[in-house]
A protein has these predicted regions:
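Ferredoxin-reductase
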Residues: 1-32, 36, 42-46, 79-81
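Short hydrophobic segments within beta-strands
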Residues: 7, 50, 76-78, 126-127, ...
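A short, well-structured juxtamembrane/interface segment
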Residues: 32-41, 106-114
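Short, glycine-rich nucleotide/cofactor-binding loops
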Residues: 46-57
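Structural motif
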Residues: 46-48, 74, 123
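Histidine-anchored nucleotide/phosphate-binding helix
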Residues: 56-67
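Conserved S-adenosyl-L-methionine
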Residues: 65-73, 144
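Reductase modules of NAD(P)H-dependent flavoproteins
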Residues: 81-207
């Protein structure tokens, strides 16, 4: 079975609002097979997990697996306040939870110190807001890239506003012009092609 955590986002494209407003217990939905672009290295001698807000979702699976294996790990979870802490009851069962509540006078989320105090060879995993991941990657400068893992909710790349190009799908006998400001996926979908996709942001790699 799946456990899916979806935070209602007023700036979303509508998916989170639909789930909160319309989906009910007993509804049947179609889902694609799971994909994992944020795999856990279970052979690491120590693991440092860093989550912000709903970024705890993929991290929680890692917590469960590491705890099951009896592996050494630390979890740092940052939220604005206690009301935004997801899965608190389950996470509270782990003695190595470090909770950071920015609006409640809690301990500052010092990524540099967290990284510096980790054992040599530790693997680091971070998922959360863009600002957190950017700060984490900066603080992790100097750590072997194979030990640093992130999962983002949005793509930093911007769609080109100048130029344009032509694509010819391998299984199609025709070409498609991609104008400035458009993505290949949006043009192919508009043309009626059956293109596999998921996030529509160029992150997951499905398309």
């Amino acid at each position: 079975s799946y456990v899916v955590a979806v935070k209602r986002d007023r700036d979303s494209r509508g998916g989170s609002a639909f789930i909160h407003d319309h989906m009910r217990i007993g509804d049947v939905i179609a889902v694609s097979p799971p994909r994992n672009n944020f795999p856990l290295n279970e052979d690491a001698e120590h693991t440092v997990l860093i989550a912000g807000g709903i970024g705890i979702t993929p991290i929680l699976s890692m917590v469960r697996r590491l705890a099951l294996n009896g592996s050494s790990f630390d979890l740092h979870y940052s939220c604005r306040n206690a009301a935004e802490v997801a899965f608190y009851e389950e996470l509270g069962q782990f003695g190595n939870l470090n909770l950071h509540l920015s609006e409640c006078g809690g301990r500052l989320f010092d990524l540099g110190t967290i990284i510096a105090e980790a054992p040599q060879g530790a693997h680091f995993y971070c998922c959360g807001p863009k600002s957190m991941i950017d700060a984490f990657e900066l603080a992790a400068t100097g750590i072997n890239a194979s030990q640093v893992h992130v999962e983002r909710f949005s793509n930093d790349s911007e769609v080109a506003v100048e130029g344009g190009f032509v694509v010819k799908p391998q299984r199609e006998g025709r070409s498609f012009a991609i104008p400035p400001g458009r993505t290949i996926l949006s043009v192919l979908k508009e043309a009626g092609l059956d293109v596999a996709f998921s996030c529509e942001q160029g992150i997951c790699g499905t398309c």
